């Protein structure tokens, strides 16, 4: 199996099968690992360059199994022009490959809001079509 430049953490409990890859998503290919049940994205898509977002979505799609899920948190900044993404941007990139559902908005506590200038996080669940 090809390697990816990064670190792999694996759960040692035989009752649970969990792998956590810490690497660049753009280096990750289905030849490294595929058929994931789920991917947790906490800001990676939002932080990616606009020109790379479609490639990001394509890579995620390629490594998920048929009914795989993406759990995505998108930060809502106090100043809207500082990188807040709306559902249209997500939909334009994940398009027909996924069915998207907005689950909730998690409001930031006052300390987090002041320190990072963030109102909270929009949480999305996307199912692979």
What are these regions (language model features)?
Residues 1-18, 22-32, 57-59, 63-129:
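Class I (Rossmann-like) S-adenosyl-L-methionine-dependent methyltransferase catalytic domain
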Residues 47-59:
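A short, conserved alpha-helix within the catalytic core of class I
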């Amino acid at each position: 199996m090809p390697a990816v430049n990064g670190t792999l953490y694996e759960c040692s409990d035989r009752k649970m099968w969990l792998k956590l890859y810490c690497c660049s998503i753009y280096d990750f290919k289905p030849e490294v690992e595929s058929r994931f049940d789920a991917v947790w994205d906490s800001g990676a898509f939002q932080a990616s360059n606009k020109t790379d977002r479609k490639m990001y979505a394509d890579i995620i799609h390629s490594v998920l199994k048929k009914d795989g899920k993406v759990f995505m948190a998108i930060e809502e900044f106090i100043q809207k022009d500082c990188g807040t993404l709306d559902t249209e941007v997500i939909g334009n990139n994940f398009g027909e490959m996924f069915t998207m559902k907005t689950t909730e908005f998690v409001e930031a506590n006052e300390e987090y809001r002041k320190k990072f200038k963030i109102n909270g996080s929009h949480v999305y669940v996307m199912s692979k079509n």
